[in-house]
């Protein structure tokens, strides 16, 4: 199957016109019912939805049938959330009905021993027989923030906030639990998500397939959590074609981590040294933590890329200037001296404590901030800015908003850190979509990641 044909079929996972939720019923705590409820009441999904259960009962006012073959209209996507033992039979029914896209959210397959592996092989056989592409098994589902479609089980009304704003970052998550952590963090911060897909055991559709798909849609940055790589050569070849930033946090770096991944999503052990080498060759940014999955992408969606490693540190605290210099140097960034021309311009601004790099502005007024930053960003010896404000004042918000405009004007990025209450920072990020980081280390890491992406793209163009 060529890439174009594959992406056309994968499109139905994210933009189905009709959905069947197999296993949805009115039994208390039924997970399939939470999907129907979300589609009906929270997302107001415009297409037909049906519930498949033994009693053929309605769920959330959607009609019920005892088999997908009884549904009188075509179905684009089936979501199966039933005991593992009956999943193969439902996959066969879907094939006979002509359904070519299935999300299998049920667990109990190759991650749980010989019997589970046998069931998974049956699913594979039916999928090949009928030309079905499927996600999972043992996955959370799919969310498309652009079209307001979501088949996550356990969806609740608070998730509606996440659908108020579509962003530029799409996520591929092997673990449903990690997906929930990322989703909740982004929802609290009101960062817009583009799409999120949980792949679980990824028996059919894997991370490379989705990377290919996201390369052709309106995604800006692709962020992944993996416990193993299904096919390293395939992933590397696809990644080399992609010009969008790819970020991956992979667990299983140690023997203990690999053992845990095996029991969780049936992952095959991958050599971490080989994976690290693949990332460098394919231009994949390897992340160090779960938090980086949702904190760092905004640096690449909201700021220009860092085109060199020469950084100006700008603060109203001499201590933070010293601390940041250590962190940046250890990270491979440099803190160059300003040129005589830049120093002359800076010296004309009154009331500045120190015009050397790092700059210590002291307790200055907003216009002083902006005048200094304008000079620094315009300086040819500077590639980017680390902006730190140790004192929170309301005018800092206005300063940061203007700095965002300056960065776009000069085509240079700024990583922003203010060591104040998280609630204040989140409030600003929610309102203005500004990449403010929760720690100085995170802000410096964002600059490093931006520079890594620029260097790889430049290398590809040669």
Task: Outline where the language-model segments fall.
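Catalytic-core regions of core metabolic enzymes
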Residues: 1-462
């Amino acid at each position: 199957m060529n890439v174009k044909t594959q992406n056309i079929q994968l499109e139905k996972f994210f933009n189905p016109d009709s959905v069947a939720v197999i296993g949805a019923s009115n039994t208390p705590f039924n997970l399939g019912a939470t999907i129907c409820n979300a589609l009906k009441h929270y997302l107001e999904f415009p297409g037909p939805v049906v519930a498949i259960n033994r009693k053929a009962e309605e769920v959330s006012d959607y009609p019920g049938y005892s088999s997908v073959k009884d549904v009188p209209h075509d179905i684009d996507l089936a979501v199966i959330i039933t005991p593992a033992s009956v999943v193969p039979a439902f996959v066969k029914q879907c094939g006979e009905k002509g359904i070519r896209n299935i999300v299998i959210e049920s667990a109990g397959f190759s991650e749980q021993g010989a019997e589970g592996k046998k069931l998974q092989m049956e699913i594979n056989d039916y999928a090949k027989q009928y030309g079905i592409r499927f996600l999972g098994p043992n996955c959370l589902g799919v969310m498309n923030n652009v079209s307001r479609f979501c088949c996550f089980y356990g969806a609740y009304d608070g998730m509606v906030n996440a659908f108020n704003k579509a962003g530029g970052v799409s996520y591929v998550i092997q673990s449903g639990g990690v997906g929930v952590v990322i989703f909740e963090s982004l929802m609290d911060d009101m960062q817009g998500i583009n799409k999120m897909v949980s792949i679980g055991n990824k028996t059919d559709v894997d991370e490379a397939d989705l990377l290919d798909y996201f390369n052709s849609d309106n995604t800006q940055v692709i962020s992944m959590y993996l416990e193993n790589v299904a096919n390293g050569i395939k992933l590397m070849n696809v990644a080399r074609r992609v010009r969008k930033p790819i970020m991956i946090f992979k667990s299983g770096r140690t023997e203990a981590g690999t053992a845990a991944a095996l029991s969780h999503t049936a992952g095959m052990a991958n050599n971490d040294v080989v994976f690290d080498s693949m990332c460098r060759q394919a231009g994949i940014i390897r992340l160090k933590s779960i938090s980086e999955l949702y904190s760092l992408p905004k640096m690449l969606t909201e700021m220009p890329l860092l085109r060199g490693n020469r950084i100006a540190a700008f603060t109203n605290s001499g201590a933070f200037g010293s601390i940041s210099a250590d962190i940046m140097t250890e990270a491979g960034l440099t803190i160059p001296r300003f040129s005589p021309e830049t120093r002359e311009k800076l010296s004309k601004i009154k009331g500045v404590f120190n015009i050397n790099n790092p700059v210590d502005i002291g307790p200055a007024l907003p216009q002083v901030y902006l005048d200094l930053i304008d000079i620094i960003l315009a300086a040819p010896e500077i590639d980017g800015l680390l902006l730190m404000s140790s004192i929170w004042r309301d005018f800092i918000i206005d300063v940061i908003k203007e700095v965002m405009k300056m960065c776009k004007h000069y085509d240079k990025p700024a990583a922003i850190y203010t060591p104040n209450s998280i609630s204040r920072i989140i409030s600003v990020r929610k309102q203005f979509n500004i990449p403010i980081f929760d720690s100085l280390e995170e802000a410096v890491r964002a600059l490093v990641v931006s520079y890594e992406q620029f260097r790889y793209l430049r290398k590809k163009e040669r």
